[in-house]
Every structure is written in C-alpha cells, then in structure tokens.
C-alpha cells in the first residue's frame, strides 16, 4: 500500500525537469541528466550591490548599480540570465510550483555562505523584465 501511495502522484502529476520541462525520472534532482550541464551559475567576481557577474576582478559594481540608485541594500543572483530564463519564467508564471524544491535546494547549496553572512530579513523574488 505504501508503494502505491508513492506511485500514484507520479502517475497523475509526472515529474518534469526544471530546465527543459520534459517528463523525466528526476527523483530528488529536479533536473534531468542532459540538462544539468546546461545550467550556468554566476561566478566571482560579482557586483557588490546586485550580484550580477562582472567582467573584471577590479570592478566593484556593475554598470547598472554604478549609475542607478536601488531600493535594496544587497542582492545576489544564482544563474546567468540566459541559461535558466525560460525555466524561471515557467516557475513564476507558468504554474510550475514543483520547481520550487529544485530552486530552493540549489539556492541553499550555492548561496548558503552568502545567506549566513547577510542574514536577510526576507528573500524576495525579482520580477522578470
């Protein structure tokens, strides 16, 4: 009976890869094996204000943060804009709440040090523009 309880949800609501959205056996991963290498994470150096990847190590702020005032103290980013744009759009606007586990785990694994250092009062998603 316990096995049936685990199988039925997968039959009714098959798991989808958070990158390509294909139905896939991704138990615990969130992303299929063919898509895992396609994810591009932002690496250092990063903007000290918003977290965008910078071209040069000696830069402190990106072009946008150098020129504009923002209404937040510090931000961070996980993915390069292009690699996960469609996935983030589906998650936010395409009724894919099942991606939340993948995004939450990925954020925790990759940005745990930052989050522990900053101790944010809230994690706020940014609108896609």
What name fits each language-model region?
Residues 1-129:
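Glycine-rich phosphate/pyrophosphate-handling loop used in enzymes and phosphotransfer proteins
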């Amino acid at each position: 009976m316990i096995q049936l309880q685990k199988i039925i949800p997968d039959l009714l609501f098959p798991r989808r890869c958070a990158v390509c959205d294909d139905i896939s056996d991704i138990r615990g991963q969130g992303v299929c094996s063919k898509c895992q290498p396609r994810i591009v994470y932002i690496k250092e150096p990063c903007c000290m204000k918003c977290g965008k990847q910078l071209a040069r190590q000696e830069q402190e702020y990106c072009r946008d943060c150098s020129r504009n005032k923002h209404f937040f103290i510090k931000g961070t980013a996980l993915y390069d804009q292009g690699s996960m744009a469609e996935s983030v759009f589906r998650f936010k606007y395409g009724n894919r709440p099942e991606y939340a586990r993948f995004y939450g785990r990925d954020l925790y694994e990759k940005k745990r040090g930052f989050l522990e250092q900053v101790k944010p009062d809230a994690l706020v998603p940014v609108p896609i523009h």
